[in-house]
Regions:
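Conserved active-site and SAM-binding loop architecture
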Residues: 1-187
């Protein structure tokens, strides 16, 4: 029977099991005040290298909490992956953390209209994966993200999820990110 580890021992154990390799950097996209970056740093035992957010207040707070990161205060679609990697001093991304806006998927939004551009933010993961080497991607979102599908425009011009096509876009996104393998494929 194994022994139980306390939180600090688990974190140290995870950091030893998963660390950055030579030349790898860590990315926190959609970085807010730095909570995800703090967790990443606890596991890896080193600072996050690249942080991106379009909101100046969020980036200023992140800078205070994580001064060693290269900060980008701009639309994530406008950040050039190759340039960000070059400026960070790395040659690949060992860990990329993605937290695209969840409000346009969450059931907490109720029946209110949704924004296509915000719902499409997760596609930026594919852009980065096609442009720079990434060893491990983490994408955090609400469980309703799995229902991501096409939108229909109603009579008022508002966009709402097509109830007959739930999950279609999520499946396409997963295929694009995994070169078509099922997320449950053991290979």
């Amino acid at each position: 029977m194994g022994t139980l580890m306390n939180e600090n021992q688990v974190t140290k154990s995870m950091g030893k099991a998963f660390g950055l390799l030579a030349g790898e950097v860590a990315l926190d996209s959609f970085a807010g005040g730095g909570g995800a970056s703090t967790g990443i740093e606890q596991v890896l035992g080193c600072s996050v290298d690249i942080a991106i957010n379009h909101n100046l207040d969020a980036i200023e707070m992140h800078k205070m909490n994580h001064p060693n990161a290269q900060h980008y205060c701009e639309d994530i679609w406008d950040v050039d992956p190759e340039e960000a990697l070059l400026r960070s001093g790395g040659n690949s991304i060992g860990l990329a953390w993605w937290s695209p806006d969840c409000t346009h998927f969450s059931i907490a939004k109720g029946g209110t209209p949704v924004n296509q551009a915000i719902r499409g933010l997760a596609w930026v993961v594919i852009k980065w994966a096609l442009r720079v080497p990434i060893r491990v991607n983490f994408l955090e979102n609400v469980k309703e993200f799995r229902t991501w599908g096409p939108l229909l425009q109603d009579d008022n011009g508002d966009w709402r999820p097509d109830p007959d096509r739930k999950g279609e876009t999520f499946k396409d996104f997963t295929k694009a990110l995994t070169v078509g393998l099922s997320p449950r494929d053991p290979s």
